[in-house]
């Protein structure tokens, strides 16, 4: 297999979907911010553990919903927002919280409640697919009632067939994510004389010492370093423990030298905005938000020549959620092509909803050429999905990455 193409069959299908001018979905979130090895092992809980009982659903008598999500992942500046439209159409009020900064960090906050089937303070949330798989395998999430999600039929077929949830009974893709290089255009050119970073080595320029940030999401940051070293991160024969530790050594060295100043979750955007960071390993959609807040095209985003990472964040309903039907209605709303298009046009992530591209073009014809929402085959050839890890690998890899984060 061409190592530049995603190994995961879901992501390979995204390429075909792009060729057919269909819409694909987001990705990447990979994982870290300080959680203990014990927490990581708990995330890989055995499938034969005692089953949990879903909480009583009070949706019919209480038209409310709490949604925990990532920062910059909603069209909040729009008037009305899609959340406003959802309320007007359904009567359901959504308390929307941007408190999902990092997969492992969030898991660390809610793992005890999850394990007991208790309320985690959210009726619906959006972990990255690898974390969603852990929750599903551990029995932490509820099974959907598809009768409440008729628009599920609009899911891109590429997202069916996942081993952890083949028929999408417990998870639905929210957005697809790309990770690559975000950079302050003027500051980067002033410091280096170049227009934009192209390869990882560009981040190690002495002129950028102390002005580099990387994501605390292990699969993105380490994945990009691995790809720079010629490793196919979707292939178990290529992404070995030795290869991973070699990439960790590079990152650790740059942290020790002071080249990398920060390892952060979604809060990395603050460092770019205030000028502390000039270049960061970052998520594509965040750059649209940063530029919107800046009021001009201050930041750029590029995939490294060796490639960027791709993955997806997924809707899940925790076992302790008490507004399951309301959460299902929310998913159904965002799987309506027009609503998906409005959201994608703002957040600039890949949408998993069939028909959203056509609706987006009606909103703004220029969106048809936006590679961050509707990537072409050539663009997707520069992306790879991080392969699934077994429990032993997860523990070893996370422990090594955690050690580096503590030193940053």
Regions found by a protein language model. Give the residues of each.
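Ligand-binding pocket segment of bilobal, Venus flytrap-like solute-binding proteins
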Residues: 132, 211-217, 221, 225-229, ...
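A structural signal for short loop-to-beta-strand junctions that line the ligand-binding cleft
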Residues: 118-127, 142-183, 211
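N-terminal secretory signal peptides
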Residues: 1-23, 34-39
């Amino acid at each position: 297999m061409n190592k530049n193409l995603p190994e995961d069959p879901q992501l390979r299908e995204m390429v075909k979907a792009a060729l057919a001018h269909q819409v694909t979905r987001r990705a990447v979130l990979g994982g870290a911010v300080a959680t203990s090895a014990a927490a990581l092992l708990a995330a890989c809980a055995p499938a034969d553990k005692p089953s949990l009982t879903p909480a009583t659903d009070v949706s019919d008598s209480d038209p409310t919903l709490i949604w925990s999500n990532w920062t910059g992942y909603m069209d909040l500046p729009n008037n009305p927002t899609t959340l406003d439209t959802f309320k007007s159409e359904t009567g359901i009020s959504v308390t929307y919280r941007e408190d999902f900064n990092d997969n492992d960090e969030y898991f660390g906050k809610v793992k005890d409640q999850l394990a007991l089937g208790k309320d985690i303070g959210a009726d619906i949330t959006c972990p990255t697919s690898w974390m969603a798989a852990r929750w599903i395998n551990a029995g932490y999430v509820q099974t959907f009632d598809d009768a409440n999600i008729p628009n599920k039929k609009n899911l891109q077929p590429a997202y069916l067939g996942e081993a952890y949830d083949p028929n999408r009974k417990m998870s639905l893709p929210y957005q697809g994510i790309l990770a690559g290089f975000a950079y302050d255009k003027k500051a980067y050119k002033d410091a280096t004389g170049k227009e934009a970073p192209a390869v990882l080595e560009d981040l190690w320029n002495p002129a950028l010492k102390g002005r580099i940030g990387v994501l605390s999401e292990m699969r993105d940051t380490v994945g990009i370093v691995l790809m720079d070293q010629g490793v196919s991160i979707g292939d178990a024969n290529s992404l070995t423990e030795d290869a991973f530790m070699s990439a960790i050594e590079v990152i650790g060295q740059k942290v020790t030298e002071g080249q990398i100043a920060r390892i952060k979750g979604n809060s990395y955007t603050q460092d770019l905005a205030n000028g502390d960071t000039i270049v960061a390993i970052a998520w594509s959609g965040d750059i649209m938000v940063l530029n919107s807040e800046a009021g001009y095209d201050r930041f750029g985003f590029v995939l490294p020549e060796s490639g960027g990472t791709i993955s997806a964040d997924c809707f899940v309903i925790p076992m302790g959620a008490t507004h399951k039907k309301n959460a299902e209605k929310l998913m159904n709303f965002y799987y309506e092509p027009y609503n998906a298009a409005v959201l994608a046009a703002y957040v600039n992530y890949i949408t998993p909803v069939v028909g959203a591209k056509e609706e987006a073009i009606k909103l703004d014809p220029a969106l048809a050429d936006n590679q961050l929402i509707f990537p072409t085959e050539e663009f997707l050839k520069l992306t790879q999905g991080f392969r699934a890890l077994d429990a032993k690998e997860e523990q070893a890899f996370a422990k090594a990455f955690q050690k580096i984060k503590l030193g940053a």
